[in-house]
Amino acid sequence: MDANLIEQKSDYNKIKKISLLLFILLILSIIAIIVLIIVLVTSEKSKTNEQNKQNFKGFNYWVEKYNMMDHIEGGKFQYGLYASNFKVNLTGFEDLERLGTSTCYYMLNSKEPGKFHKLKGDECWLFHDGTPLTMYLMNETSGDIQTKLLGLCDECDPLICVKGGTIFGEIGGEQYTFVSLETVPGYDDRDFTLYEKEELLNKYPQNKEIIETIYPS
């Protein structure tokens, strides 16, 4: 075989090996950069979560500050924060006349969910402190459930409004979730319906898993 041809072939093999080595190094560099980005993002999220936890006032702080009481549907509350002086007459409401709006403080945690209930009027939930709260909004006719997160996380909304006639329940954050509620028209016991576990299971068996989460015992 010609010496020049042998030398060219040898040079080609060397270039091929070097190219392969450079390609491998490039792939490893890309992987290292991706891993570094993941580590930095995870670290930043952990740092943010830790800062948020440190900023929490605490479950007992709010209970004591506002002298909150046990609520029939679960959690703690303090009613009478604000009630409008204006009164309205509405079709479909017993005795028709209601306050224009009213507000209260409410607090839940994962061990003390808010049982499924229904209001004739609308109710808006405003997040104040703690970890995100999960809300289950169920259509009374079809049983279809929409899940929403109340809080300040990327997937959350700090304000969630529930339309009157919706059956809904909630599970507070791992530590607690402190919120305020605004009811329109103003809250009245005659407009409130609380559901029992068996009643819901019989009517909406397709929602058994969520119902049993709200009613653990």
Question: Which residues fall in each region the model found?
Answer:
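Intrinsic low-complexity/disordered segments
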Residues: L5, T48-Q51
